[in-house]
């Protein structure tokens, strides 16, 4: 009887222990909402047989969810469109370091994380677009010049709560300092054509509708408009031209930000997750990104889509990308202080 009880107890304990057997899948927490991502995952599944499960939400919600889940989080990978959120997750201890020279060798060194917690997938620039009818290219020069009185009532941009604007402001804090950036923001707010609203596409549509003459937008949105199936969006895209700021001699270059991927600290399917990181780093996957989302490849040998190539090459701001995270709170403080809604 005692022997029976002993065996029963062993079996009961074993049944209650967590199942360590790795499943043939990966779980992604992703902020990205682009169709190209689904194409990438489908191609990866066909190639490897590994099922890709994706949970989508905004970055702050996903970060909080991983924090709450702790060691029991099912997430293997975190993907976001902003370095600031990648830095935040790494700083909170949610990620583990990723080290693979075979991946890093395919990436522009300027785009790499100095702390080793995330890998860039694509990048884009936050550019100025201008009306082909009401603005001459030679009127534009730098981000700093957007504070000039000549743009009063002519500048369109989305709200300060948007991560893209927060990243741009963070880069200005890094390059100019808080005092100069605050002065800049005050003057820029005074130049708004309307209170900030809508997304980047909406700023371009507003230019086409004559509600403003210039706008601050992410570069790839112009590609998305020009390749749209909607006539209104195509016409909006055609109504503007792209300008990369701060390109003159001795100037720092245009602000950039990345979409990136991070391996979670307690990834339950680590081997599979690493396989996906490596796949998204391949030339094939990078070409899929640029030809469908109109972003720039992190691989210098992968050319942009033809639409993007037409804008010409540009000089990138060489600032440490993690400063877009470390300066984020100061950027938000400046937004609030200067009335950028």
Predicted regions and their residues:
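Extracellular/periplasmic bilobal clamshell ligand-binding domains
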Residues: 306-341
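Short, low-complexity disordered leader/linker segments with a strong preference
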Residues: 1-26
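Ligand-binding pocket segment of bilobal, Venus flytrap-like solute-binding proteins
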Residues: 171, 176-245
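Periplasmic-binding protein-like
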Residues: 153-160, 279-303
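Short beta-strand->loop
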Residues: 29-32, 114-115, 130-132, 138, ...
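A bilobed periplasmic-binding-protein/Venus flytrap-type ligand-binding module shared by bacterial periplasmic
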Residues: 127-134, 256-269, 288-291
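A structural signal for short loop-to-beta-strand junctions that line the ligand-binding cleft
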Residues: 73-78, 96-128, 144, 154-157
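Early extracytoplasmic/lumenal segment of secretory-pathway proteins
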Residues: 17-87, 341
